[in-house]
Amino acid sequence: MTIHDKEKDKEKKDKKEGTLRLLTSGEIALAKSVFRSTIPYHKVWIHFDSYLPFGLQDQYTAMAPNGEIYFREHYREDYSHTVPFYQHMFIHEMAHVWQREKGLNVIGRSLVSWAVSYHYVLDSRYLSEYPMEQQAQIIADHFILNAEGYTKWCDLRDQDVITLDGNISEPIIRQLYQNTLRGFPW
């Protein structure tokens, strides 16, 4: 954790749950690097709160069931100025916002997302042929590979943040991601 992230942690601790904000300009730029102009960024709210009533959302779980993102313990003031772990989480949740924009029933599918595997194997399928959570993981994992490089990608895979299974040699995974993400974002 960098000094910058320690300052952000202090900043977060000074905030109270129940607050919300729009995306920062840095977060919009970060998300546009992945989703281009396929999301109405000016409508996306970031909540420092539980989506579920009575605070039932787990402290360490982020959710984006309604086109808005709900963080609790992992809330940050600006995900564009955080470590790769938090940027991965942010892009994963933005993938759910994108899925909702494309007509996927994110609320219905999110009710069982706690029970599904985030692990995936890249094969000849298109992104659209993977389940909802695996789609979000593929998008976020690929983002880290491109933004941070193969070494950081491997570090996060060792921490089970990156969830690709199978052969992970760099040239192979780059080609597999390219094949899976062909046409993305549509």
Predicted regions: what they are:
Residues 1, 51-60, 64-66, 102-123:
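Alpha-helical membrane-targeting segments
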Residues 1-17:
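Short, contiguous pre-domain boundary segments
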Residues 12-15, 23-33, 39, 104-186:
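Metalloprotease/metallohydrolase-associated module, dominated by Zn2+-dependent proteases
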Residues 15-66:
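Auxiliary, metal-adjacent structural segments of Zn-dependent hydrolase domains
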Residues 37, 56-62, 69-91, 126-128:
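Short pre-active-site segment immediately N-terminal to the catalytic Zn-binding motif
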Residues 49-53, 69, 75-77, 95, ...:
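Short, solvent-exposed loop/turn segments at secondary-structure junctions
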Residues 88-100:
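Active-site recognition of the HExxH zinc-binding catalytic motif
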